[in-house]
Regions:
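Residues forming anionic-ligand binding surfaces in small-molecule and nucleic-acid pockets
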Residues: 93-107
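Sequence/fold signature of self-assembling virion shell proteins
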Residues: 2-3, 163-169, 205-345
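Extended low-polarity, hydrophobic cluster-rich segments
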Residues: 101, 182, 190, 199, ...
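Assembly/oligomerization interface modules of large self-assembling protein complexes
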Residues: 27-97
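Structured, hydrophobic secondary-structure cores that serve as assembly/anchoring elements
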Residues: 173-214
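Alpha-helical scaffold segments that mediate packing/assembly in large oligomeric complexes
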Residues: 104-184, 340, 344-345
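Short, internal active-site loops enriched in acidic
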Residues: 144-146, 198-201, 285
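N-terminal alpha-helical "arm" segments
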Residues: 1-48, 340-345
Length: 345
C-alpha cells in the first residue's frame, strides 16, 4: 500500500540525501527525444499556434518529386507535365500519468509535503519521457523504408525484414558500409543513427581508433550522430533479429517530435481545492523543451489507511502532453528516409 508509513515519525529517522537516492530514480537515456525536439521547426514552424484544439487536425504541404521524361531529341512542339504537392497530416498521441496525495500525509512524517509532491511529479515526468522515447523508436522502426535500389553494394536488402544486412565479419566496417548504402540512395549529408546495445560498444571501439592508431577506423563516424538506445534490439526489432545488432539511420533533420498541450492548460484556470479543480502547465524538470499539462482537483477522503487522517482531503493530479512524431514523407509507395541495418552472421 502506498502510504508513506515507512518514513512516518515513529522512530528516530533522517532523510536520505538525493544523490544516494539516484539508483532508485534512474532514467533510461533518451538522446533521440532531445534530437527530435530540436528538429521540430524543420518539419513545420510554430505548430502550437496552428493547432488550437484536440479536435483540429494539422496538415502540411510539400512538393512531390517530378518524374524523369528521359528525352533524347529536341523538338518544336514538346509538352510537359505540371508538378504537384502532397498533403502531410500530423498524427497525435497523448501521454498521461496520474498521481495523488492526501493533505495530512506529511503531518507526522520526516518528509515534507512539498518534497513528496515534487518527487512524485519528477518520477511521473521520467515515466512520460521514457514512454515517449520508446514510442519514437517504435515509430521509426515501423516507418522504415520497404524500398531499395535493385542493386546494393556492401549490404543485402532483406525484403522480409525491410533491413539492410551487413555480414558480422565486416563489423569493423559496419558504419562505413552503412554510409555507403545511404550514399547509394542519394543521402550524402549528416546522419542520425540509433544503435542498440550490441552495436553501441562497436561504435565506441571504432570511435577510439583514430589517425594515431595503427588501424584508423574512426573516419567512418564522420558526420554521424550516434545515439545508443537500448529499446532498440530489446523491445523493438527483436522478432527479426533476436541476437540484436540493429541500427536505424536517417538523414539529419528528417524526423521530429512535436509536443503540444491544449490552450486551457496553457492559459490556466480554476481552483485546486474544489471538485472542479485547476488547469495549469509546468516545465520539464530535466531541461527539455517540453511543457506538460497539469490537471488537479480535490475530494473529501478517508486517508487513515494511507498515512493521512480519517477526515482528510485527497488531491488528484494528472500530467500529460500530446505529441506528433513526424517523419519526412516521400511520394513513392512504401519508401521513407528511414533505413534499418542489422549485423548478421
Amino acid at each position: 500500500m502506498a502510504d508513506y508509513t515507512a518514513s512516518a515519525l515513529l522512530a528516530a529517522q533522517a532523510k536520505i540525501t538525493p544523490r544516494f537516492n539516484e539508483a532508485e530514480m534512474r532514467e533510461r537515456q533518451n538522446p533521440i527525444l532531445r534530437v527530435g525536439l530540436q528538429n521540430q521547426d524543420y518539419i513545420m514552424q510554430d505548430v502550437s499556434s496552428i493547432k488550437q484544439s484536440e479536435k483540429r487536425t494539422v496538415k502540411g504541404y510539400q512538393f512531390k518529386k517530378l518524374a524523369a521524361t528521359n528525352g533524347t531529341t529536341r523538338s518544336h512542339n514538346f509538352t510537359g507535365n505540371q508538378g504537384d504537392t502532397q498533403e502531410v497530416t500530423l498524427s497525435w498521441s497523448t501521454f498521461t500519468e496520474t498521481l495523488g496525495m492526501f493533505g495530512q500525509v506529511a503531518a507526522d512524517n520526516v518528509e515534507q509535503y512539498s518534497d513528496m509532491l515534487a518527487n512524485q511529479i519528477r518520477q511521473k515526468q521520467i515515466i512520460i519521457r521514457e514512454r515517449i522515447g520508446a514510442a519514437l523508436i517504435a515509430a521509426l522502426h515501423a516507418g522504415r523504408t520497404a524500398v531499395s535500389n535493385a542493386t546494393v553494394r556492401n549490404a543485402t536488402f532483406n525484403s522480409s525484414n525491410n533491413a539492410f544486412e551487413i555480414n558480422s565479419g565486416d563489423k569493423d566496417q559496419f558504419f562505413a558500409f552503412m554510409r555507403s548504402v545511404m550514399n547509394q540512395h542519394k543521402y550524402y549529408g549528416g546522419l542520425d543513427v540509433m544503435v542498440d546495445s550490441v552495436l553501441d560498444p562497436i561504435a565506441r571501439k571504432i570511435a577510439a581508433q583514430g589517425s594515431a592508431n595503427g588501424t584508423n577506423l574512426s573516419y567512418q563516424l564522420q558526420n554521424m550522430n550516434i545515439m545508443p538506445h537500448d529499446t532498440l534490439g530489446t523491445d523493438v526489432a527483436v522478432s527479426a533479429y533476436p541476437a540484436g545488432a540493429v541500427a536505424i539511420a536517417l538523414p539529419a533533420n528528417s524526423f521530429a517530435f512535436i509536443p503540444w498541450i491544449p490552450a486551457r492548460y496553457r492559459n490556466g484556470q480554476g481552483m485546486l481545492l474544489s471538485d472542479i479543480g485547476i488547469y495549469a502547465s509546468m516545465p520539464d524538470d530535466s531541461g527539455l523543451p517540453l511543457t506538460y499539462s497539469l490537471r488537479g482537483y480535490a475530494e473529501r477522503a478517508d486517508g487513515s489507511s494511507n498515512g493521512g487522517t480519517v477526515d482528510d482531503v485527497k488531491i488528484n493530479w494528472q500530467l500529460g502532453v500530446d505529441v506528433a512524431t513526424q517523419i519526412g514523407v516521400i511520394s513513392t509507395a512504401n519508401e521513407t528516409p528511414i533505413y534499418e541495418f542489422a549485423l548478421t552472421t
